[in-house]
């Protein structure tokens, strides 16, 4: 009996050590349709816009990232990626139950700052009639938009055991395309997996 208890205790400790080597983070996604632009003879023209720009199909996409491990995770960089047939239009992120929104990683914020700077240079070149400068800065703006419209990178300072981070994005997709959004996190000791909530 004593030998069985000792073996059981050792097995429990070994299992806990193996389990705690990696922190399992799971995520699930819900896409709620907001609107579809259409034109037909019965209802006429319906146009969905975001920021004054027309879109074909607009979704509100929520992604929940849950720490299902036995320990807290610090300094986590989480990247939200949009499927190639879509575009991230606007975004917000927070740890549920916390009043403060998450910020972008320093690198991602630098990309936003570079985009804003390129936009300002483009507008100056446009106002001054500098066609070569306008073409250069317009190319830089378009490249930044393409990059920033497919992903967002967030800095999560601490994700405690059992806590959930929620990422909310307005996303646009072409007619008939299935919405797709994914999470990535490159950190030693952390494993991110998609898991259906039900």
What are these regions (language model features)?
Residues 59-61, 76-78, 167-169, 181:
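Hydrophobic residues positioned within well-ordered beta-strands of beta-sheet architectures
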Residues 78-103:
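Solvent-exposed beta-hairpin/edge-strand motifs
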Residues 98-116, 148-174:
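Intrinsically disordered, low-complexity Pro/Gly/Ser/Thr-rich segments with frequent PxxP/GP/PP motifs
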Residues 41-49, 102-149:
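Mixed-charge, low-complexity intrinsically disordered segments
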Residues 19-54, 83-91:
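Low-complexity, acidic Ser/Thr/Pro/Gly-rich terminal tails and inter-domain linkers that flank the onset
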Residues 157-197:
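Extended, hydrophilic extramembrane loops/domains of integral membrane proteins
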């Amino acid at each position: 009996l004593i030998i069985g208890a000792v073996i059981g205790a050792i097995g429990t400790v070994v299992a806990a050590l193996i389990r705690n080597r990696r922190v399992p983070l799971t995520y699930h996604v819900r896409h709620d349709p907001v609107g579809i632009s259409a034109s037909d003879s019965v209802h006429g023209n319906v146009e969905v816009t975001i920021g004054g720009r027309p879109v074909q199909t607009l979704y509100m996409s929520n992604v929940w990232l849950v720490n299902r491990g036995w320990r807290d995770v610090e300094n986590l960089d989480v990247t939200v990626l949009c499927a190639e047939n879509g575009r991230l239009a606007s975004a917000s992120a927070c740890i549920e139950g916390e009043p403060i929104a998450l910020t972008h990683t320093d690198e991602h914020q630098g990309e936003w700052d570079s985009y804003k700077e390129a936009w300002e240079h483009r507008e100056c070149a446009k106002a001054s009639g500098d066609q070569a400068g306008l073409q250069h800065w317009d190319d830089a703006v378009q490249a930044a938009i393409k990059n920033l419209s497919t992903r967002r990178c967030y800095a999560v300072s601490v994700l405690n055991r059992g806590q959930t981070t929620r990422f909310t994005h307005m996303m646009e997709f072409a007619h008939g395309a299935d919405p797709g959004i994914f999470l990535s996190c490159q950190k030693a000791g952390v494993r991110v997996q998609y898991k259906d909530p039900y």
